[in-house]
């Protein structure tokens, strides 16, 4: 099935605008890829799951379009466990060995981990070089590749070391979703559902109606979901690129979810720990339950969200073995907190997310205890 090309410009105050392009076959478009390299050096950063499928093709496309390019490659182990300061150091070393100058470009070929790591390396090398995001997972296409957040994890918490570094471009080749494992597809759908939950009730309803097509990987349904999700994120990011206010709404479920990920030691291919999308799914349900407990919303909306996530084969309960006290301790390190007080994204029902400062820890503990 041939999908229409979709593009969306993100215009940020005081920052170079960039375009999100969504279509099949984009990784073979060497002229488009190489057109974003201002100098002669490019680093292609990918992971052990994605590189065997696409890295050689991207390298060939770049060199066919620009034979003068010096293209370095770095392949990291797949999974959140690679998003570390050590792996970040490997990316910096790769740039140094390439002889990359300030007009170099880093290409992030992979999912959210690769995008975060490559973006952070680009932000730091010589105080900032270009980064082009080439997302290959649904989660990266609809969330992490858009907006310029880059980071690595440390044992104390997720994404605590990072920078805002908007990409030069986001080029999402939807053909890459054909090789995406079903679990990773579902993880991406959790972030898609988030957009309906925070600001688009009609999209929430559409997702319910199209759930079977989306789970089956129907190309047309996925293209529509990706485009709608990117529209929502781009609109918010353009108004609040540095997350001083409204952009925090995009974190519905993330404070709870990040606590789960950190306490489990982060997910990795082949283990039973929740991946990012799964943890966010659980986190959204917890946020909805807390909202109802605080009198902000009703139980009917909470159940509608839980049911939709369940229908997409996503978890909705805290995994066994995680204590409320341990999760709360992780939540205290969340970047949205102010003056040591919990600041959470909650909601007043489907499509009506809200930033709530100074949430009482006792109320959170009660929700975490179930």
Swiss-Prot record:
It comes from Xanthomonas euvesicatoria pv. vesicatoria (strain 85-10) (Xanthomonas campestris pv. vesicatoria). GO terms for biological process: amino acid biosynthetic process; aromatic amino acid family biosynthetic process; chorismate biosynthetic process. The keyword Membrane does not apply. This is 3-dehydroquinate synthase. InterPro entries: Dehydroquinate_synthase, DHQ_synth_AroB, DHQ_synth_fam, DHQS/DOIS_N, DHQS_C. Belongs to the sugar phosphate cyclases superfamily. Dehydroquinate synthase family. NCBIfam families: aroB. Gene3D superfamilies: 3.40.50.1970, Dehydroquinate synthase-like - alpha domain. Keywords: Amino-acid biosynthesis, Aromatic amino acid biosynthesis, Cobalt, Cytoplasm, Lyase, Metal-binding, NAD, Nucleotide-binding, Zinc. Its cofactor is Co(2+); Zn(2+); NAD(+). Its main location: cytoplasm. It is found in: Cytoplasm. It is an enzyme of class 4 (lyase). It comes from the Bacteria. One of its GO terms (cellular component) is cytoplasm.
